[in-house]
A protein has these predicted regions:
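Conserved "HGTGT" condensation-loop signature of ketosynthase/thiolase-family condensing enzymes
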Residues: 1-107
Length: 107
């Protein structure tokens, strides 16, 4: 069996520390925390990591459709768009059926 090689060509992230991997990295280096006091009485938590002040770009999703999708879809689109832009993979002649994306979510 032949082993297939993989390459990680771009990463994208969004969390309580920032809206992209660069912001998250820089805030982490400065010792900042993405955890804050929960002010939502419907959540049974005292502290949590909240994504604040985030608005998905109109380029990623038509403004008329934004309300149709939950916030986690907006976050996934943002992170995957960042990874694709970092990779520059869409500007190559690679077989797109050989390209994949791995997405992880933590709650």
């Amino acid at each position: 069996m032949t082993q297939r090689r993989i390459a990680i060509t771009g990463i994208g992230a969004i969390c309580g520390l920032g809206h992209n991997s660069k912001e998250i990295w820089e805030n982490g280096l400065m010792g900042r925390s993405g955890i804050s006091i929960n002010e939502n009485p419907e959540l049974p938590l005292n502290y949590a990591g909240f994504i604040k002040n985030f608005t998905l770009s109109d380029e990623l999703l038509n403004p008329k459709e934004k309300d149709r999708f939950d916030k986690f879809i907006h976050y996934a689109l943002q992170a995957s768009s960042e990874a694709l832009n970092q990779s520059n993979i869409l500007n190559t002649d690679l077989d797109r059926s050989e390209i994949g994306c791995i997405l992880g979510v933590g709650m």
